Amino acid sequence: MTTAEAASTVHTSFILKVLWLDQNVAIAVDQIVGKGTSPLTSYFFWPRADAWQQLKDELEAKHWIAEADRINVLNQATEVINFWQDLKNQNKQISMAEAQGKFPEVVFSGSN
């Protein structure tokens, strides 16, 4: 799914982007501007660091972002990180395409 397609399926001003990797998952947020997007944050890597907390801090520092939008993005990030971590804990691998199918409102890229 392209960023524009994801943006059109969920009417929001922001979109969660995920790098789906074997040893890490990375999360970032883009702002939807017109028919395109603009990077809002850098990528934060889990479990290398507390990506969720870093994302939360970054979004809270941008006071112009509505609380509802912050909560929505952080809830999506929580679901993706938990899903990835649960798979790692079970020694399972899932393809990026399968992850994209589970989270159609999130834009995925990665190595598998």
UniProtKB/Swiss-Prot annotation:
One of its GO terms (molecular function) is structural constituent of ribosome. One of its GO terms (cellular component) is ribosome. The lineage of its organism: Bacteria, Bacillati, Cyanobacteriota, Cyanophyceae, Synechococcales. Part of the 30S ribosomal subunit. Keywords: Ribonucleoprotein, Ribosomal protein. Pfam families: PSRP-3_Ycf65 (PF04839). One of its GO terms (biological process) is translation. This is Probable small ribosomal subunit protein cS23. Probably a ribosomal protein or a ribosome-associated protein. Belongs to the chloroplast-specific ribosomal protein cS23 family. It comes from Synechocystis sp. (strain ATCC 27184 / PCC 6803 / Kazusa). InterPro entries: PSRP-3/Ycf65_sf (IPR038447), Ribosomal_PSRP3/Ycf65 (IPR006924).
